[in-house]
Amino acid sequence: MKSLLYPHPLSLPSFSSSISTAKPRHLTPPFLKLDSSAVKTPTLAVGAALDSATVNGFSFDTRNPTVSSSYRSSSLPKPNPTVLEAQTRVCTGPTQTKPLGEDQAFKVLDTILRSATGELKDEEPVSRAQLGAFFAAMTIRANCFPEATQWSEGESRAMNKYWPLLVRALPPDVVFIADPEGSLMGIGSSIGPQFVGNGTSEMRLVGALREVLAGGHLGFEEVQGCLRDVLPLKSTTEDGTATGVSESLLSALLIGQRMNRETDRELKAYCLAFDDELGEIPIADVKSLTHYGEPYDGNTRFFRSTLFVAAVRSCYAESSVLHGAEWMPPKGGVTEEQMLKFMGADTSLTPSQAKVLLEDEGVGFAYISHREARPSLYSLVKLREHIKKRPPLATSEKVQQFVKARGKEAIVTGFYHEGYEDSLLMLMKRRGVHSGLVVKGEEGALSMTTRLRPVNSSKGIPVNYCSGFCSLSMASACEIDGVSRQSFNLEVNAVDYGFEPTDTPRTDRSVLKNIELGLTALHGQKGPAYDRIVLNAGMVDHLLGCDGAEGISVALDRAREAIDSGKALERLWNYVKVSKQVRHRPAMCI
């Protein structure tokens, strides 16, 4: 079976010899080389160097590094599936929430009760984070949601039966979240009204939650104060005793603010709260730097092209910083970190080490892990899995500057839910970048597609919708007035620029398939993946106002040349090699 999955490596012919006079340099690791038939029919030849534990000497804590779901850390406790399914329905917005039916409501509350009393034997226990998220959602729905998404009759009957039992079995912090005023459940209780938390950090959090659970909003300083008080999250010590803040309270705050739809000041607080966590932000000596903010939880269906786009743009001095996580809930899809790790790159670079790669004339782009750049926020990975739905951080973490530039800066990110495009652009302007772009991409990602818009597409913002701004001077967005900044909104139709309409290639959580598509395209094989990389490199250059990209056709041709010359592929393998070298350089050399 292993020989079928990982055939012997095939030799790589000189793709660049016929299209470039420069001496070809093939930095492709042996286990990822393609032969001529592999380019015509994209099949990644992964050699015997890949075994169940290592790839090219790189250790994996995964059973199958070719699949995104295997990058979930085995040390993370799993959430209870029964309650998690209910959270999928109720921990969302005032129009998206789907009330539970009576049978499901009874099953969920019975599961919570049996877990609290230690009688749940056939499933994982219901975590404190799950309890906080679920009961916060129920409280907010009862207090301030429209009638259609308030409690169903079945939910009310289930709560009437189980609450007298739950109020005696649940810890006080969860009872507070479920009934903060002591009047919601129909039986008087003094626990909620009198609850203040343990210590000053929880006291601040409880005060904030009273506002959020009633459907209210918090100020900038209040949100930042809560976050800085409790993060990094430390739920238990080595001997198992509790420390830090209650996970139920924190999860209630995160999901509660999302359900209430965050205000601009709340999002700014999340975005900027830990900017100084690692000290002064390094400044790269590059003329142009684009920060790519892909969704941290990855792609589960479609080809993720941004890593390969960054390699293309670096060929003509458009530097890029990519940032994200190895694995992030709720989707747990394919990420740039998984691909780079699979290819043998070092994915634990600090921002200062990333600066070196940006300034390297043979590389020109870098990836920074959330784990290294924002350890406080990264400590929430387990909690984020247990609250199920995306917290405010899922929006704010996409608009970050882990490295700055001496030249112009831009931020590109994607969105899914209508309305968040304006919030993301607001955060970009607050960051002070010269240009910003948000894209309605497939799966909420930032990549444009070459597929045609369906004739019977649903209402709302279409895929390939772009909105952004471009500064006309070197002054930052914080310093210029509206006259000096051009705003734009458009829907990109790839057919208008000579692309054949094609569906986006599917990867379905396969890290291997995503790499295969990207490498095949960078080897010059024309097709949907190649077109998607060219479209996203050229259109981003044009929309951000990059030098040499004033005309769209010129920008697209420049991207094609970077691929067809072999330069983009060389840049990618330069990155793999140099990233490992940078990690071992003395700190004084960086």
Descriptions of predicted regions:
Residues V286-E359, A366:
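A generic, well-ordered mixed alpha/beta core segment in the N-terminal half of proteins
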Residues M1-A45:
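N-terminal chloroplast transit peptides
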Residues S75-E85, R89-P146, G197-R204, V212-D264, ...:
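N-terminal glycine-rich anion-binding loops that anchor highly charged ligand groups
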Residues A133-P171, A252-G293:
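Translation machinery proteins
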Residues K2, D51-Q87, L100, A148-E202, ...:
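Glycine-rich anion-binding loops and their surrounding alpha/beta cores
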